[in-house]
């Protein structure tokens, strides 16, 4: 990168994450799944080894482990997604803003990414209201990119800050993978997904090269 490019390049100012309160050991999840998938191909000892070789010791989920033992309708799971995704996204966003020395009113654009639930209006609208963003703060919802969402969101935030060098952009990604679990789905793919994914949120603040200094002293944990 040339010195001229460096002077005009956007900056990633801060990063923060948030996880739900329920932490579960991989051994706990394995035992639960073995019981639920008993008698199916996915519940065989051979396939259950995916839990042992995942490299994961502990994950966070948004509900107690026992909650997943009961059948849940899509409406119930999605309503919980909206509630929990908003809470986690807001927690990560507030932490990222604090680390950047910013208030929500300093933001010019909010980019929100998720794939594990749906909402209309989309959650970027709910999040902007919850944070207290200015009415003219623009929003971009991105849905359905799965594991690629974080990279795509950062690219979008960079493009926005490059187009408006004075802009401050908040990007928030939230996934509640546990709420997509269907206990009646005995397919191997459901087993593998259950062995890998969890719930959480991440937020970053990206700003253009000409963004004014933050109104507060950035907090570095």
State what each model feature region is:
Residues 74, 111-112:
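Membrane helical hairpin/interfacial module
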